[in-house]
Curated annotation (Swiss-Prot):
Coiled coil: none
Known role: One of the essential components for the initiation of protein synthesis. Stabilizes the binding of IF-2 and IF-3 on the 30S subunit to which N-formylmethionyl-tRNA(fMet) subsequently binds. Helps modulate mRNA selection, yielding the 30S pre-initiation complex (PIC). Upon addition of the 50S ribosomal subunit IF-1, IF-2 and IF-3 are released leaving the mature 70S translation initiation complex.
PROSITE patterns in the record: S1_IF1_TYPE
Domain S1-like, first and last residues per copy: 1-72
GO MF: ribosome binding; rRNA binding; translation initiation factor activity
Name this polypeptide is given: Translation initiation factor IF-1
HAMAP family: IF_1
Cellular component GO terms held in the UniProt record: cytosol
Family matches, as InterPro entries: NA-bd_OB-fold, RNA-binding_domain_S1_IF1, S1_domain, TIF_IF1
Length: 72
């Protein structure tokens, strides 16, 4: 999939789930399941409840996404 096809949205982590998954509430009040991107895992960036994050969504499945950035 080309990178241009991904949708980027901001959201807030509302729940930590097993297997490094997170429930994220997007700006438009939709809730999705998100997992951390590989570079975030590699650099050991922690994501906690209440953190503001940037999520990449694919147009094929808008219920799951990849957390690519944690805002400070």
């Amino acid at each position: 999939m080309a990178k241009e096809e991904l949708l980027e949205m901001r959201g807030r982590v509302v729940e930590l789930l097993p297997n490094a998954m997170f429930r994220v509430q997007l700006e438009n009040d939709h809730e999705i399941l998100g997992h951390t991107a590989g570079k975030m895992r590699k650099n050991r960036i922690r994501v906690l409840v209440g953190d503001e994050v940037l999520v990449e969504l694919t147009p094929y499945d808008l219920t799951k996404g990849r957390i690519t950035y944690r805002f400070k």
